[in-house]
Amino acid sequence: MKSTDLISAFCRPVPFWSWNDKLEPDELRRQIGAMQDAGMGGFFMHARGGLETEYLSEDWFRAVEASVDEAKKRGMQAWCYDENGWPSGFAGGKLLEDPENRAHYLRFEKKPGFDAAALGVYTLENGHLRRVTGAENGISEYLCVYDCQNSSTVDILDLRITDAFLALTHEKYFERFGAEFGKGIAGFFTDEPQYFRYETAYTPVLLTEYKKAYGADVLDLLGALFVDCEEAPGFRFRYWRLMNVLYTENFMGRVYRWCLSHNCHLTGHTVEESELYTQMWCCAGVMPFYEYESIPGVDWLGRKTGTELAPRQVSSAAQQLGKKQVLTETFACAGWDVTPKELKRIAEWQYVNGVNLMCQHLYPYSIRGQRKRDYPAFYSEHNPWTDELKTFDDYFTELGYLLANSREQADVLILHPIHSAYLTFDRANDEASVRSVGEPFNVLIERFGAAGIGHHYGDERLMEKYGSVKDGRLTIGECTYSFVVIPDCGTLDSSTAALLKDYLSQGGRLMLAGRKPTRIDGEIADLSFLQGNLTWDELVRERALLPEANRDVRCTLRFAENGNFLFAVNLSETDTADMSVKLPFAGVESYDLLTHEMKAAAFERAADGIAAKLYLAPGESVLLMQNDSAIPQAQKSPIAETMELGGKWTRSAPVQNTLTLDKAALSYDGKMYTELLPVPYISERLLREKTNRKLWLRYAFTADFLPDDLTLELETLQHTKLSVNGTEISLTGQGVLDRSFVRGNIAALARKGENEIV
């Protein structure tokens, strides 16, 4: 399948479809139809907690077969998710059965005596680290580093383990559905692959790979990861750079090449992309990861936005590498009470920074039991505004299509400083250890975003592979830059230093935005050639689209065969934005993404283009399409019409009048009950107590009047008796909230006043 074919078929949102119960082909087909009705263009078949069909069993593959068949009939995209849970790599637990496959990490201890069990033992002498191989006179404190393992994840930096993962997962799909690869099955989603992030990561692969890369024994200075010494910056640089290489090449590169050789695509995301120090936890830099994806992706949790770092890292790499689509797995952990307005703001913040394809988290097969607590909200029939989902999805389909098929005006390159974080990163001190690099960088990129200066990030590994200089401009892959910005940083790769030296010698324009680096490849070096010749004020005059006082509006200027445009969004949740934006057009109109209508837009002509007027309410956005024949318009009042409300009004309920009983009293004998407790608390309490005995749960509600139809709906419960006001009943009707639920009319058993259900 060509990339262009994939884009035309895969422009609608594609949710995580949580396969979390006993999978029935007819129900799978029905849910696929519901997805299409909601404006979705496909799905990721994602094994998650609650799954009762055995993962990768014959029944599992029958479910896949039915889903692929239904997707083909409907012109939708079916994608495989490469794991049972996450992070990717452990093959549903099979690889964890062998201790040799488990992830490694390092533990550091100071001891009064030499410990032969340690991976490496060191002493500190006058600020220098020295490895010792036995007890020595005069050493009072031995610095010991231990190789430890964790039983929950595998060592994906080991090619042997990656190949085993592919054999146990991807090859199984190919054996069954090889003819559908690139047709009915678009490809695979990989989720949060990582080295062990909860301690200082390590892999035995380093014992050979470090010597190949640097001609030295990694154990000679391993203690420098934990001890500040003269050797620490250089060693840490070499260590973490190689860890990043092993992460991207031995896992992601290997999986990507397998997918390409089997006629399918790869998408997904790494983990903890939003800060430099969190990237150090997991992979030592996310941008090289994106080289090995057909559709690079990012993950964004919760209902807040952050700095532009996470979405702009992935979109920078995608544009440089010629990958049109950029995916976001988004909306997890936003909570049941999140509103469409909030979700629109979260998504548009990512889209204005270069994302263009939505993967909603989550579309559950079932919400029975704990399944309903799987990082909600859900974007399925369980959503109270499910009838409006299609409008929401249609909007982002149109926006994503326009962004994917356009080129961003971004000829400013900001060097990504993750390699400077290598010099000082210490897992024990975490964020504080790289704060001197991370904080100034966050301030800098927010300044660029607020000014509306189109920019990308330059990852030094990608620059080494794809960077070149010609006529005083720096190129990375398919993107060329007229300006380069060096943020506050401590080191440059030797390949980066060579590029910049060539760039400056050809008259390239360079801005130094902080501490000038003093090292190359982590070692002290002469960088006297690195002299800035560009100021912030000069860059603002030449490239800023937004006024200096702006805080909340972000924009992207786009050029495309079908029309050039500006997309702008007000990210504030409370403040209206009222400002002008400079555009290199002769005129603009406002484009409605839902109706496809063009409307007059306020602008006035200027010497070098126009000044378009923006008046954006909190969370509001606008798309201004170039139309050089448009006539300048004065800004109209945002209040189009006023009316006085009076008289009597009738309020209508858009859904059934329902009451959720989410608190219960717990008893172990049916006589003595606790106070009313939240049901999740009761569940956690029983798990802590490891209770395996008869229980009673008493729910209560009060009725002021008794309707003819008083329906009780609850989850299907095995080995359970149910009573209403002391009368035992059974419910047989199919539930409405979820098809696994049951319901029935209890009006005849209810009474005015207090009622109880046990």
Where are these regions (language model features)?
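Aromatic-rich membrane-interfacial microdomains
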Residues: S730-R743
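Aromatic-lined ligand-binding clefts that engage carbohydrates, nucleic acids, or primary amines
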Residues: F701-G726, I757-V758
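Catalytic and substrate-binding clefts that recognize carbohydrates or anionic sugar/phosphate headgroups
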Residues: F90-A179
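Short, surface-exposed tryptophan/glycine-enriched loops
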Residues: S740-V758
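Extended low-complexity, serine/threonine- and proline-enriched intrinsically disordered segments
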Residues: A116-N126, V588, H719-G726
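Carbohydrate-binding surfaces of carbohydrate-active enzymes
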Residues: L6-V14, K22-R30, G42-R48, Y55-G93, ...
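Acidic/histidine-rich, surface-exposed loop or edge segments in extracytoplasmic proteins
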Residues: F10-F16, H46-G50, Y146-D155
